[in-house]
């Protein structure tokens, strides 16, 4: 006889009491350790800087670093970057961003490539961007008829993004740090 072990599920009020950095996906807690390394931070900062600059002429949209996004009573995630085109209120977002960026580490690649891919697609995030620092590659997905369609793999090309309230060009080549920065 096969016995099924039921996993305990948690909710946002539980999540709010936890110490440390966690995400809660479909009621399951997932630790966000170890913290992002130097290369991860450089890539994330470069993407943030470019998005910030690109969105400056568009007062309806803004880019935010590592903010909690509460999709349901059992799901709260903290993407590396999000772009929203609605007024943010409170300490977390409770509506889907239009664009999410995750800088992928080998330790959490399954979470970003499978679990969050499905979650963001289901929740209606228009663009999902996965940055791979070691490969110096960025994958871009766009939601089309409720399904992510791969726009492409980008290394140093440019791409135009069309959000609900603005559009902008993004230069993927400017994301990658130069050899031996600040040395």
Question: Would you name each region that the model predicts?
Answer:
Residues 1-183:
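Gly/Pro/Ser/Thr-rich low-complexity, intrinsically disordered segments predominantly at protein N-termini
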């Amino acid at each position: 006889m096969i016995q099924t072990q039921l996993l305990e599920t948690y909710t946002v009020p539980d999540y709010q009491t936890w110490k440390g950095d966690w995400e809660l996906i479909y009621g399951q807690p997932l630790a966000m350790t170890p913290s992002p390394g130097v290369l991860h931070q450089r890539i994330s900062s470069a993407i943030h800087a470019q998005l910030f600059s690109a969105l400056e002429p568009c007062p309806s949209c803004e880019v935010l670093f590592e903010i909690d996004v509460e999709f349901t009573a059992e799901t709260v995630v903290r993407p590396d970057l999000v772009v929203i085109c609605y007024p943010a209120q409170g300490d977390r977002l409770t509506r889907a961003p239009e664009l999410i960026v995750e800088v992928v580490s080998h330790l959490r690649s399954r979470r970003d490539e499978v679990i969050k891919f499905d979650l963001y697609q289901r929740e209606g995030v228009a663009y999902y961007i996965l940055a791979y620092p070691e490969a110096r590659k960025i994958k871009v997905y766009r939601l089309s008829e409720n399904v992510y369609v791969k726009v492409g793999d980008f290394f140093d090309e440019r791409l135009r993004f069309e959000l609900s309230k603005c559009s902008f060009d993004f230069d993927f080549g400017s994301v990658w740090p130069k050899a031996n920065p600040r040395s």
